[in-house]
């Protein structure tokens, strides 16, 4: 008679297994890979708390689009803003985000995931007040730089926190909440920007971090971080809070401890050497690839310069109304993805996303080419908005949120902080390059050429997803790590495991 090990059972099955009790009788029980998957209320609270920070990030990302119009109006602004300075108002935030992303890695390792997230709240408030009270362009740039630094830290720490606290059954859904709330922030900025100038918009931005700070104070640190610090009892309490008072958290805690001990045995004393190990390099390169194709889709150029793009297109629809429509669609598409991601999986949504973006970017490029050739486009003035709507739906349902979700899933626990720091820094480097050079690209190859360029990048991104990106739907972090590092046992016999028979 061969007894099967519970740890060998595949993640997607819930097999019935007979165990022999102390009195010699067989006991039938269900092996569940996680504890109490029904109780998720506290996990929802934790997800909402950190996602409020993402709303601040979204507001900061969208600020340039409505603010620059009034900032460059000399009847509103007491100081002059040149075109070059205006480009830095948009470009300095991703550059500072790069610095924040690099600094965020050590922060989440030594301060903890929660404390790092919480530490961004007050600097966010200070940054927005600097902009609101600015009497020179330098104060605006200082505020944008400080907010960008916080955005970089938040971009790194939010997905790591959620990846380490939420159960696999709902990790996809709750893991997309930061993106959904980020899109709420974008929408708030677009709507408010229609009615207030750049200074009033900054005052609104200074209010948003307050509820984020209050809610974050209520949630625990991640159990996995406590385990890495040798605080097993604190990890147990955090798990109990997250899974419910009546949940048996011991199996999950033992799995976390075992995974950490295994990672420690394979780790070197040098973090850089750990990153460069072949087993760790694979998930890191996949994360970098996802970030590259996310930003080279041109999304930040679209968000930062939405009003200007519609003005250049000669759209018959009010420019500010266009940005609000795009914001509403962005928000709605993310919630659509939130509903589907744990049903369809990550890769299917990425396929749909990339295809939609390829088609719409090529369409936009063709529209601008037709217009720039001197043709009358007044009868298709609706086309830029229609293309933008489909483009945003495509981005927000896959390429936008999923790379951040997978950042907290595929990176091994031992290097999660440093690897996430590298990936986030790389993301913001790409963001800065695209944002700062978008105007130069348009000047060099025309706006039609710019959209065609981004469309080709999205097409390449589709093939990257097909051949290199793994499916993580429904898998625990420990199982994903074993698979990515090539330490998964062959489980064909376990997958077909039958109840053991006993002669009684």
From Swiss-Prot:
pH dependence: Wide extracellular pH range, between 4.0 and 9.0.
UniProt keyword list: Cell membrane, Glycoprotein, Membrane, Stress response, Sugar transport, Transmembrane, Transmembrane helix, Transport
Record field: transmembrane: 40-60, 88-108, 121-141, 146-166, 172-192, 200-220, 284-304, 321-341, 348-368, 388-408, 425-445, 449-469
Bilayer disposition of the protein: Multi-pass membrane protein
Extracellular membrane side: 61-87, 142-145, 193-199, 305-320, 369-387, 446-448
Xref: Gene3D superfamilies: MFS general substrate transporter like domains
Cell compartment(s), UniProt: Cell membrane
Glycosylated residues, chain numbering: 73, 197
GO MF assignments: sugar transmembrane transporter activity; trehalose transmembrane transporter activity
CC annotations in GO: plasma membrane
Tissue specificity field: Highest expression in the fat body. Not expressed in other tissues including the midgut, muscle, and integuments after 24 hours of dehydration.
Induction summary: By hypersalinity.
Keyword Glycoprotein (UniProt): yes
Main location, first listed in the record: membrane
Chain's role: High-capacity facilitative transporter for trehalose, required to induce anhydrobiosis. Anhydrobiotic larvae can survive almost complete dehydration. Does not transport maltose, sucrose or lactose. Mediates the bidirectional transfer of trehalose. Responsible for the transport of trehalose synthesized in the fat body and the incorporation of trehalose into other tissues that require a carbon source, thereby regulating trehalose levels in the hemolymph.
Protein name in the entry: Facilitated trehalose transporter Tret1
UniProt source species: Polypedilum vanderplanki
């Amino acid at each position: 008679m061969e007894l099967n090990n519970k740890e060998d059972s595949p993640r997607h099955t819930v097999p019935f297994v007979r165990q022999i009790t102390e009195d010699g009788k067989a006991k039938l029980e269900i092996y569940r890979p996680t504890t109490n998957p029904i109780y998720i209320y506290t996990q929802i609270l934790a997800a909402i708390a950190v996602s409020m920070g993402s709303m601040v990030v979204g507001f900061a990302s969208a600020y340039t689009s409505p603010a620059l119009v009034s900032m460059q109006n000399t009847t509103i602004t007491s100081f002059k803003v040149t075109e070059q300075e205006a480009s830095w108002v948009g470009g300095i935030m991703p550059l500072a985000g790069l610095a924040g992303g690099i600094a965020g890695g050590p922060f989440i390792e030594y301060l903890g995931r929660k404390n790092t997230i919480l530490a961004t709240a007050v600097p966010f408030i200070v940054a927005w007040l600097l902009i609101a009270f600015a009497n020179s362009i330098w104060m605006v740039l200082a505020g944008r730089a400080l907010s960008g630094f916080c955005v970089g830290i938040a971009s790194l720490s939010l997905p790591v926190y959620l990846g380490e606290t939420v159960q696999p059954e709902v990790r996809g859904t709750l893991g997309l909440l930061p993106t959904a709330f980020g899109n709420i922030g974008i929408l708030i900025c677009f709507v408010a920007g229609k009615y207030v100038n750049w200074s009033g918009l900054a005052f609104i931005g200074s209010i948003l971090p307050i509820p984020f700070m209050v809610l974050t104070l209520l949630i625990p640190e991640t159990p996995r971080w406590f385990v890495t610090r040798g605080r097993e009892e604190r990890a147990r309490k955090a798990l109990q809070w997250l899974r419910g008072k009546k949940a048996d958290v011991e199996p999950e805690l033992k799995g976390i401890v075992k995974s950490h001990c295994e990672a420690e045995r394979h780790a070197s004393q040098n973090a850089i050497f750990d990153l460069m190990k072949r087993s760790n390099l694979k998930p890191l390169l996949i994360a970098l690839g996802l970030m590259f194709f996310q930003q080279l889709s041109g999304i930040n150029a679209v968000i930062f310069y939405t009003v200007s793009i519609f003005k250049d297109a000669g759209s018959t629809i009010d420019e500010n109304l266009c940005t609000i429509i795009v914001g509403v669609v962005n928000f709605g598409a993310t919630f659509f993805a939130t509903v589907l991601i744990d049903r369809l999986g990550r890769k299917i949504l990425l396929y749909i996303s990339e295809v939609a973006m390829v088609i719409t970017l090529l369409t936009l490029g063709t529209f601008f080419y037709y217009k720039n050739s001197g043709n009358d486009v007044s009868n298709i003035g609706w086309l830029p908005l229609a293309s933008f709507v489909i483009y945003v739906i495509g981005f927000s349902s896959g390429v936008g949120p999923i790379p951040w979700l997978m950042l907290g899933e595929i990176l091994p626990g031992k290097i999660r902080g440093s690897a996430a720091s590298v990936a986030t820094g790389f993301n913001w480097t790409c963001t800065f390059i695209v944002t700062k050079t978008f105007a130069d690209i348009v000047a060099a190859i025309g706006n039609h050429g710019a959209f065609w360029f981004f469309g080709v990048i999205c097409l390449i991104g589709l093939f990257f997803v097909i051949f290199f990106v793994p499916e993580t739907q429904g898998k625990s972090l420990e199982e994903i790590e074993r698979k990515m590092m090539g330490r998964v046992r062959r489980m064909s016999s376990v997958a077909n495991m039958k109840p053991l028979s006993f002669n009684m």
